[in-house]
Amino acid sequence: MEGNAKIEPQDRENLSPRFRMMAAVDMNTTGRKKGKWYVAVPPLCRAWTGLTPADYFGRSLVEQLPEEIKVGVINVAVGGASIDLYDEDKTTEYISKQADWFKNFCKEYDDAPMRRLMECAKE
C-alpha cells in the first residue's frame, strides 16, 4: 500500500538498522536513489507519500526475530490501483483508462510497476 497517513516525529525515531527499504524511485527530497538500500525511515514508497502498513509491520517483525536477521521491503505502490496494474498483460490498457494524476504516479515506475519491483528485487 502506498500510504497516506501523516508521518509524525515519533514515526522517525528509534528505528532498527535491521529494518531496511529499497527505494523503487529516486527520492530527491530525501536523497534516496532507486535500487539502493536504506534504513526504513518513512516515507517508504515515494518521497511525498505517507506512513504505510509496512512501516510498523517491519518494525514489529524485527522486534520478534533473532538479532542476526534483517527485514527488507520494496514498496512499489499506487494508491487506489487494481491488481491489474501489476499484471504485465493488462498494465498498459489499465493505465490508459485512468485519470491523469494516476498516470503521473505510474510514470515514476516507467509505467511498469511490476517490472520495477522485479528489477529492484534482483539488485
Regions found by a protein language model. Give the residues of each.
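Cell-envelope and extracellular/periplasmic
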Residues: 1-123
